[in-house]
Amino acid sequence: MTNVTIEQAVKGYLVFSAKEGKLFREGRSYLAGKTYHNRYLAIYEKLEDAVVNASQYPSEEGITIYEVSGWGQVTDFGKCKVTEWLKLDQIVAKKEWVALLGKQTNSNYASLRILAARLSEDAAVLKKLAQDKNQQVRSAVAENANTPALVLTKLGVAAEVNAMAI
């Protein structure tokens, strides 16, 4: 654990739920705004680590990952840094982090991958998930069959999803 000074401001990524208006870090949440004053907000240096954090909240809608900067007192915890002051710089495009989720084979990521695909109407991701070799992933597609029918029809997977749901 290392503290860095204001001159060593940190850039990184942070997970946010637009629906709840909260920021997430290890199960705790905080009210959101443009700038935050809370020493427990985590900034992940790598987008991959922020995506892993986001995958802990698969039932949340409107999950967003922000590119952020922190300044003031910053504590280094290795994969993440905790800062007293935090500024939202920009939203990371969903395509970027959905692609990282797609590289994960663990079925725990399935619900978030489906949610992200539905929100972005990423047909390729949905189709791939519907044909995944992992039964749990296919089941998660079936459980999330409220994906817009038009999208599923375009994919040609509506029949597969309905069959799995039965």
Task: Place the predicted regions along the sequence by residue.
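Short aromatic-glycine-(Arg/Gly/Cys) micro-motifs in beta-strand/loop hairpins
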Residues: T2-L41, E67
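N-terminal regions of proteins, emphasizing targeting and processing segments when present
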Residues: V10, K19, S55, G72, ...
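Short, mixed-charge low-complexity intrinsically disordered segments
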Residues: V51-A99
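Alpha-helical scaffold segments
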Residues: K94-I166
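Alpha-helix C-terminal capping segments
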Residues: Q8, T35-H37, A54-Y57, A116-S120, ...
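A short, charged, amphipathic alpha-helix used as a generic interaction element across diverse proteins
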Residues: K34-E61
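N-terminal compositionally biased, intrinsically disordered segments and leader/signal-like regions
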Residues: N3-I6, Y36, I65, D76, ...
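Hydrophobic beta-strand residues in large extracellular and virion-surface proteins
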Residues: Y13-V15, Y44-K46, A50, I63-V68, ...
